[in-house]
Amino acid sequence: NLNQWMLKITAYADRLLADLDKLDWPEKVKKMQADWIGKSYGAEVDFKLENSDEKITVYTTRPDTLYGATFMVLAPEHAMAKSLATDETRADVEAYIQMAANKSSVDRLQGKEKTGVFTGSYAINPLNGAKVPIWLSDYVLADYGTGAIMCVPAHDDRDFAFATKFNIPIIQVIAKDGKEIENMTEAYTEAVGTMINSGEWNGMESSVLKKEAPHIIEEKGFGRATVNYKLRDWVFSRQRYWGEPIPIVHCPDCGAVPVPEDQLPLLLPDVESYEPTGTGESPLAAIDE
C-alpha cells in the first residue's frame, strides 16, 4: 500500500448535487453526474456472528427486506474475511481472496458470471434469529458502504443469480397485491408491494416501510439510519510537473506542511524542460529556489 494525497471531494457531495440545478447542462448529463455521486438513503444493520460477540455491519438501501436476507456477502478484502474461514474452508477462502486481488474493480463489477466462496461461518439475522451463511464474492467492493451486504435474492437480480447458482434459499417478502409467487424464476424488483413472510411487518406497504425501517431498526438497537454515496475521494496518483500542484511543503523537520491559504494558488516555476529525465528526478529537482 502506498501513501497517496487525495482530494476530499466526498466532503462536498451534497453541494455538488444541489448545485447541479444551477448548471445550464443537458438533463441527461446532470443525471449522469447525480448517478456518479450516487447518494442513497438506507441503514447500517449489525449482524452478530453465531456463537460470538463479534458482529458484521452491512449497509442496505432496503432495510424493509431484512426478513428476506438469506445470506451475506463480504468483499474479499474485508478485514474479517480470512478470520471467518473454518479449517474446512480456509484453503478455498484464501485462494479466492488471492484471485480477487488480481482483478480490477471494473472487471469485478462487469463480470456477468457471479463467483464466490462460503466461509463456513454464519451470522444471525437480528429480526428473526435465523442463521445467515457468510460468503465472499468479488462483486462486493470494500470501499463502498461497509464492504459487506445482506442479500435478499427474492428482490435483487444480482442476489437472485448468486443464490440460484449456489443453491441458497430464496424467501419472498414483498408481493404484488400480497400474493406470493409460487415458483420464482426471477427476482421481484417492483418498487411497491405488500410485505409478506415478515413477522410484525406483514401487511405493510413496502414503500412506507422502506422509509420507516431504518428508524425501527435504530430503536431496536441493532442498526442506524445512514446516508451513503458512491462518490469516492480523488487519488492524485502519478502526479507530474504538468499536473495540478498539491499545496504541501515537505519540511525535513516538520514533515508535510500545508501551504498557507494566503499563498494560494500555488504556481510552479518555469523550467527549461519538464519531460522525464530517465533518472526518476522531478523537473523541479534542478530548481535552486
Protein language model features and the residues they cover:
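Residue patterns forming the tRNA-binding/recognition surfaces of aminoacyl-tRNA synthetases
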Residues: 1-56, 63, 148-286
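A short local loop/turn or secondary-structure capping micro-motif enriched for an aromatic residue
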Residues: 65-67, 141-143, 267-269
